[in-house]
């Protein structure tokens, strides 16, 4: 038989697999011993052999003679055994975990206005205040004594275990001025002067990003005081002259009325602006907490100039809390709560502190302001750092907050800054805005603008080491930025984020305000110790579960199936990466087994079975009839027996969990799934390219995520009524968006390879069919836009679907996210052996954290 060369050559493609239902080019009648007329069909193939011979009575009963080939699975039993660590959960670990949980719960419950460390700089300013009774003594002698007792061995004041030249120089200058004013501590003053002389010349070597807030305002002003007091300091150093020039330039740019028009960050540094401040006007900007922007030093300066009783009340309030010293700012109640919640969530230990997190967020929400929030509830100057953190966390926990709050921090050029009217921004605040921007709802253009702006800034920051950081000195802020850019919200699975943040988290991180300060309820060893113990404990349970599932796979005979992908470990990694808590072990097992069947049956319907056999398989599921297995070929017998036995067991366990029969429910879920598979097989048989809408209607089901979720949901620990099931059912928008986004990300990364293997229908190809005037690149871009919009809508469904139990919502939403991770760079399931997914599986399941 001869085939026209143009017909044959136009159909031959390279590839590793053979199309499921062939495009037939010709046939040759052949007799059989049974006397039936059969035909030999030739078709183009997709494996090493480009022309495939098939025999059958008609095209739709033709079994392939060349098996579809997939890359072999990496995670074989011997590989898993070789990676099994010696770690086991010891009773002492369990006891320590319980102790840490109790201690951290107490930490949350004791949160008041914020815990922080002493500021020698601010304490020196408070110690300056003369007694209000007219005696020639300090109003707060305990603060003066603190200065005398807390000079460091090198003659400086500040944090003993952290050295930043700017911070030490500033604190030391403030302390020697105060001691000189009170004519005490001559020895300490002299040692402080010697320190200043030796270090001031080296300060130029310090990164500009380490310069405290307002340094160029307060430092020159204090130097002027020191000179008037006769302190022998190196006033002519080039560095000092440069700082003085910066101060003068900044003051010249300052509009005369801005200082009094509305609260700004200038209120934080009034002690450095005393010669220009109108004290009567400035009193109108005093905060509700009686301070000036929560700054003890600024408030002390105002009190010494005005005698305002409210200022004195604020200082008494702070000293009542801290005793003989003051911090660099106080209160810090919103900042402390938000960052503590963020910390335990990123470390993956938040499941131990649900009530404490709710209490903390209720507190923050009760002080939420549509204009933004600052670090304290009565802080009149909002900042983008606290606001973005609050917007993201509150939204994800179901609080009603609007993204319009970010407009406060955007200038006319569309750039985002930390404080209103300023150009200051740092890596940490832009990172928090970026993280916030990914929890957008549909139509929130401000979130898209924030995403683009911050991504640009952060990518540039990675190339510029000087950009790290304006507001914080963190252990590995670069690592945090790299993770956030590579794994944004819709790709960031909880276990992967926990693993990454355990490595990046600094239990001794410090922040930069006017001086360096620490937040022990945000950065501490207890969080990190619990995170490591809990991660390794959970991972140990996961490895045991994976071994059980591997035994199920092997005992069911699935390892004998040559036509399908063996991806048991990768599939188990999916639920383990997000529904990781020990109490969801059964749910993870059901999720994994169901997912494995979706892969087996997808490969069966897509590339292996004839239409007749596929219809028989579907009918067997519909009738739930094991007797029909006798009519199936051997490999399909293995499939159906395993399917039948597994879901009978799952249904029985589901009956116990739900208190009612769930087998018919599971059957119906699978009937819908197999109908979608069958339709795709029928399309492929005749090389039919549907319209985009027709394709998506079926493909959002055939992606099989809904089947996995709808069956697994029965094991989330909740009694699911018909009403609840309907809210995540096939007709729900929530489930549809999960399937849609999963299908689109799959198609965008696989359509070219599958087209080379003979597949004719994908979101991109179907969209091009509807719009023949556009290019493939334009169609792909449009599909990405549809997916991005759907992800925004999925965010909204996840946040607002509060009638659905939390674990069910997580199940739907996280299943959508795991698809974004698997297909971020290609087909992460089929090609998982040589992709980053392999490392994720290893880190999540086999490699304990040290």
Swiss-Prot record:
One GO cellular component term: chloroplast
GO biological process, one term: defense response
Motif DXDD motif boundaries: 383-386
Binding-site list for substrate: 250, 470
Coiled-coil spans in chain: none
Sequence positions that bind Mg(2+) 4: 383, 385
Motif (DDXXD motif): 602-606
E.C. no: 4.2.3.32, 4.2.3.18, 4.2.3.132, 5.5.1.12
Cofactor(s) in the UniProt record: Mg(2+)
GO molecular function: abietadiene synthase activity; copalyl diphosphate synthase activity; levopimaradiene synthase activity; magnesium ion binding; terpene synthase activity
Binding site for Mg(2+) 1: 602, 606
Reactions catalysed, as given in the entry: (2E,6E,10E)-geranylgeranyl diphosphate = (+)-copalyl diphosphate; (+)-copalyl diphosphate = abieta-7,13-diene + diphosphate; (+)-copalyl diphosphate = abieta-8(14),12-diene + diphosphate; (+)-copalyl diphosphate = neoabietadiene + diphosphate
Transit peptide location: 1-52
Binding site residues for Mg(2+) 2: 602, 606
Keyword Plastid tagged: yes
Origin superkingdom: Eukaryota
Sequence positions that bind Mg(2+) 3: 746, 750, 754
Pfam families in the cross-refs: Terpene_synth, Terpene_synth_C
UniProt pathway: Terpene metabolism; oleoresin biosynthesis
Annotated compartments: Plastid, Chloroplast
Cross-referenced InterPro entries: Isoprenoid_synthase_dom_sf, Terpene_cyclase-like_1_C, Terpene_cyclase_plant_C1, Terpene_synth_N, Terpene_synth_N_sf, Terpene_synthase-like, Terpene_synthase_metal-bd, Terpenoid_cyclase/PrenylTrfase
Function: Involved in defensive oleoresin formation in conifers in response to insect attack or other injury. Involved in diterpene (C20) olefins biosynthesis. Bifunctional enzyme that catalyzes two sequential cyclizations of geranylgeranyl diphosphate (GGPP) to levopimaradiene. Levopimaradiene is the major products of the enzyme with abietadiene and neoabietadiene. No activity with farnesyl diphosphate (FPP) as substrate.
Family, as annotated: Belongs to the terpene synthase family. Tpsd subfamily.
PANTHER family for this protein: (E,E)-GERANYLLINALOOL SYNTHASE, ENT-COPALYL DIPHOSPHATE SYNTHASE, CHLOROPLASTIC
Recorded domain comment: The Asp-Xaa-Asp-Asp (DXDD) motif is important for the catalytic activity in the class II active site relevant for the cyclization of GGPP. The Asp-Asp-Xaa-Xaa-Asp/Glu (DDXXD/E) motif is important for the catalytic activity in the class I active site, presumably through binding to Mg(2+).
Protein name, as recorded: Bifunctional levopimaradiene synthase, chloroplastic
Organism: Pinus contorta (Shore pine)
């Amino acid at each position: 038989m001869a085939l026209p060369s143009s017909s044959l050559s136009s159909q031959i493609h390279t590839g590793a697999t053979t199309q499921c239902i062939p495009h037939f080019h010709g046939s040759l009648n052949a007799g059989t011993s049974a006397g039936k007329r059969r035909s030999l069909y030739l078709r183009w193939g997709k494996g090493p052999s480009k022309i495939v011979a098939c025999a059958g009575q008609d095209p739709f009963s033709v079994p392939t003679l060349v098996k579809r080939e997939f890359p072999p699975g990496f995670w074989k039993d011997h590989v898993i055994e070789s990676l099994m660590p010696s770690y086991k959960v010891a009773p002492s670990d369990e006891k320590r975990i319980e102790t840490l949980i109790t201690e951290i719960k107490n930490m949350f419950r004791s949160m008041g206005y914020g815990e922080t460390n002493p500021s020698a700089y601010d304490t020196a300013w408070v110690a300056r205040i003369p007694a209000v009774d007219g005696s020639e003594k300090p109003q707060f002698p305990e603060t003066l004594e603190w200065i005398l007792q807390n000079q460091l061995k090198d003659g400086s004041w500040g944090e003993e275990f952290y050295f930043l030249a700017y911070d030490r120089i500033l604190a030391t200058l403030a302390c020697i001025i105060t001691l000189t004013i009170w004519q005490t501590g001559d020895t300490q003053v002299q040692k402080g002067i010697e320190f200043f002389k030796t270090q001031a010349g080296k300060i130029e070597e310090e990164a500009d990003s380490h310069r405290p807030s307002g340094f160029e305002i307060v430092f020159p002003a204090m130097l002027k005081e020191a000179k008037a007091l006769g302190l022998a300091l190196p006033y002519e150093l080039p560095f000092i002259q440069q700082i003085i020039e910066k101060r003068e330039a900044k003051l010249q740019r300052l509009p005369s009325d801005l200082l009094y028009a509305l609260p700004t960050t200038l209120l934080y540094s009034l002690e450095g602006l005393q010669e220009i401040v109108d004290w009567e006007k400035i009193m109108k900007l005093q905060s509700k907490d009686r301070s000036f922007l929560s700054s003890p030093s600024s408030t002390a300066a105002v009190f010494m100039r005005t005698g305002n009783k409210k200022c004195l009340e604020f200082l008494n309030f702070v000293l009542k809390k801290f005793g003989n010293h003051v911090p660099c700012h106080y209160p810090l109640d919103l900042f402390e709560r938000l960052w503590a919640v963020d910390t335990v969530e990123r470390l993956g230990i938040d499941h131990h502190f649900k009530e404490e997190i709710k209490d903390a967020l209720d507190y923050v929400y009760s002080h939420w302001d549509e204009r933004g929030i600052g670090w304290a509830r009565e802080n009149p100057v909002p900042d983008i750092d606290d606001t973005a953190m609050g917007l993201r966390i509150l939204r994800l926990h179901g609080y009603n907050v609007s993204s319009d709050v970010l407009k406060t921090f955007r200038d006319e050029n569309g750039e985002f800054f930390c404080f209103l009217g300023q150009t200051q921004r740092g890596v940490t605040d832009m990172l928090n805005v970026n993280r916030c921007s990914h929890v957008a709802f549909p139509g929130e253009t401000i979130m898209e603008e924030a995403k683009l702006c911050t991504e640009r800034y952060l990518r540039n920051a990675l190339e510029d080491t000087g950009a790290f950081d304006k507001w914080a000195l963190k252990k590995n802020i670069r690592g945090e930025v790299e993770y956030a850019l590579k794994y944004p919200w819709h790709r960031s699975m909880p276990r992967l984020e926990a693993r990454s943040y355990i490595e990046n988290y600094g239990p001794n991180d410090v922040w930069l305000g006017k001086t360096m300060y620490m937040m022990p309820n945000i950065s501490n060893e207890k969080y990190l110790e619990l995170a490591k113990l809990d991660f390794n404990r959970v991972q140990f349970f996961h490895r045991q579960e994976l071994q059980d599932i591997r035994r199920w796979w092997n005992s069911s005979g699935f390892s004998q199936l040559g036509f399908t992908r063996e991806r048991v470990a990768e599939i188990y990694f999916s639920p383990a990466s997000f529904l990781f808590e020990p109490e969801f072990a059964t749910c993870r097992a059901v999720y994994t087994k169901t997912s494995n069947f979706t892969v087996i049956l997808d490969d069966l319907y897509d590339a292996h079975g004839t239409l007749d056999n596929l219809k028989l398989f579907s009918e067997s599921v519909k009738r739930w009839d094991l007797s029909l297995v006798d009519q199936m070929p051997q490999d399909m017998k293995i499939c159906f027996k395993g399917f039948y036995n597994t879901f009978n067991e799952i249904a029985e366990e589901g009956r116990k969990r739900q208190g009612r029969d769930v087998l018919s429910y599971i059957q119906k879920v699978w009937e819908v799934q197999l109908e979608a598979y069958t339709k795709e097989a029928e399309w492929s048989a005749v090389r039919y390219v549907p319209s985009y809408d027709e394709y998506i209607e079926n493909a959002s089901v055939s992606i099989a995520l809904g089947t996995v979720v709808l069956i697994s949901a029965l094991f989330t620990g909740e009694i699911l009524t018909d009403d609840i099931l309907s809210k995540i059912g096939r007709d729900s928008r929530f489930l549809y968006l999960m399937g849609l986004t999963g299908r689109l990300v799959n198609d965008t990364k696989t359509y070219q390879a599958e087209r080379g293997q003979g597949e004719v229908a994908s979101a991109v190809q179907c969209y091009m069919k509807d719009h023949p005037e556009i290019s493939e690149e334009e169609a792909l871009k449009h599909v990405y836009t549809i997916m991005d919009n759907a992800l925004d809508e999925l965010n909204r469904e996840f946040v607002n679907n509060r009638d659905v139990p939390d674990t069910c919502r997580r199940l739907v939403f996280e299943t959508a996210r795991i698809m974004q991770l698997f297909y971020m760079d290609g087909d992460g399931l089929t090609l998982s052996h040589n992709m980053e997914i392999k490392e994720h599986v290893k880190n999540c399941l086999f490699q304990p954290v040290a």
